[in-house]
Amino acid sequence: MVVVETPVFTRQICAFLPDDEYRRLQLALVLRPEQGALVPKGQGLRKLRWGQPGRGKRGGLRILYYWDKEADTVYLLFAFEKSNQADLTSDQAKAIGRLIREELR
């Protein structure tokens, strides 16, 4: 399994998680890439809830990623805190879905 990060994701995740916790996230996705919920209209985009130290899953992060099963690759696209944005808007999901369709498939 290959894990690829977008530059945006790298900046975001470095601000949210210490290195050891980020390694746990990567390992969790390598072991079970299907665990994130599929985002409607997201062209295969998945959203994973990930706890931050001291906050748990509910108040933690949302990790947006795309799993290309055939290429055995997980693309880490965006990370955000639930306290800043609870969910994607329909327009955001469509835009990211377009990116996946045009660039990653």
Model-derived segments and their meaning:
Residues 67-105:
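Enriched for short, Lys/Arg-rich terminal
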Residues 27-57:
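A short, surface-exposed loop/turn module that caps and links secondary-structure elements
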Residues 1-20:
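Arg/Lys-rich, positively charged N-terminal/basic patches that mediate binding to nucleic acids
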Residues 8, 19-20, 24, 44, ...:
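Sequence/structural signature of beta-propeller domains
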Residues 53-55, 66-69:
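Short polar/acidic secondary-structure junctions
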